[in-house]
Amino acid sequence: MAGNTLGQLFRVTTFGESHGLALGCIVDGVPPGIPLTEADLQHDLDRRRPGTSRYTTQRREPDQVKILSGVFEGVTTGTSIGLLIENTDQRSQDYSAIKDVFRPGHADYTYEQKYGLRDYRGGGRSSARETAMRVAAGAIAKKYLAEKHGIVIQGCLTQMGDIPLEIKDWQQVEQNPFFCPDPDKIDALDELMRALKKEGDSIGAKVTVVANGVPAGLGEPVFDRLDADIAHALMSINAVKGVEIGDGFDVVALRGSQNRDEITKEGFLSNHAGGILGGISSGQQIVAHMALKPTSSITVPGRTINRFGEEVEMITKGRHDPCVGIRAVPIAEAMLAIVLMDHLLRQRAQNADVKTDIPRW
């Protein structure tokens, strides 16, 4: 199975399955001398981990990360960093009924078509459980970006179902279980989630992630454009079906005179481009959005087939998120951090001596 690695100079390779013994990853490219402890990684893992509220799956995994290598006396050595999280709350018996049945909307059918077999326990490698290691690796990148370059990455929920959420207060995001920046909408989200649980159904969501303090010049035209790599990283997250950079699809309704981000000696007058022009960061805030589909793991009966081609009715058992967008917020932050750190290292490697007299804001 290929496709388990992201990045060129900052490289993250993950391994493990939902109901296997453990999840792990190898992080290459971390510069030496960076202070790093397991506690530095645990905060974001706790934000992502299951069982933290009544609105998410009740699978209770502590997600305690272990640093196996690459750190000595509290600082990175410049060698590969090995990370491990043990699985402790698997209930594989919940999935015995789907051993020969393809859950509609899941990767069961496509994995079996590709490999001729599949790990049906919680989806195996296709499960979003794998993203725990992305968050751990992303926490390393976030720490490096913040401490060495002053880059701060934040994410939040900006829509659930037909409830749009305004980014009114970033401080509110960590104060509620929805990662919601709009305190006026929390009651509506709670009501929607209660209704979904009662119905046994699920709902989609939109997540926004931003990066402040990114310098101008990151991105490698033409095939490794910064926006292309961000979209690639975000699209690799489970359940993501669309990614927008800046105004995204809204630019269709704009005229060129409206959409262009005009420049004065004080700086840019707008940021429709989301901080990226020609695939290269402009020094403005980087803005990305991703759309997540409603999970197909629901108790509403649905039609499917088994591996023998027979039609059957499917009701998904197990412990699942009514809205996967909630726990996707720290995952989106991690993926953006991984991409930005990779491009920072690439920029330093090729263009460290480049100086310009052009203003930077």
From Swiss-Prot:
Keyword Kinase listed? The answer is no
Q: Which cofactor does it need?
A: FMNH2
Superkingdom to which the source organism belongs: Bacteria
Give me any GO biological process, just one. Answer: aromatic amino acid family biosynthetic process
Q: Which UniProt keywords apply?
A: Amino-acid biosynthesis, Aromatic amino acid biosynthesis, FAD, Flavoprotein, FMN, Lyase, NADP
- Top-level EC class as recorded in UniProt: lyase
Cross-referenced Pfam families, in alphabetical order?
Chorismate_synt
**Endoplasmic reticulum found in the keyword field:** no
- Tell me the cofactor note: Reduced FMN (FMNH(2)).
State the EC number(s): 4.2.3.5
Residues annotated to bind FMN = R125, S126, S127, N238, A239, G278, K293, P294, T295, S296, S297, R319
Pathway of action: Metabolic intermediate biosynthesis; chorismate biosynthesis; chorismate from D-erythrose 4-phosphate and phosphoenolpyruvate: step 7/7
**Which GO cellular component terms, listed alphabetically, does the Swiss-Prot or TrEMBL entry include?**
cytosol
Q: Which reaction does it catalyse?
A: 5-O-(1-carboxyvinyl)-3-phosphoshikimate = chorismate + phosphate
One example of the protein's molecular function in GO is: FMN binding
* Residue sites binding NADP(+) per the record: R48, R54
The protein's assembly and partners:
Homotetramer.
Q: To which protein family does this belong? A: Belongs to the chorismate synthase family.
Q: What does this protein do?
A: This reaction introduces a second double bond into the aromatic ring system.
PANTHER family named in the record: CHORISMATE SYNTHASE
Instruction: Name it.
Output: Chorismate synthase
Q: Which organism is it from?
A: Citrobacter koseri (strain ATCC BAA-895 / CDC 4225-83 / SGSC4696)
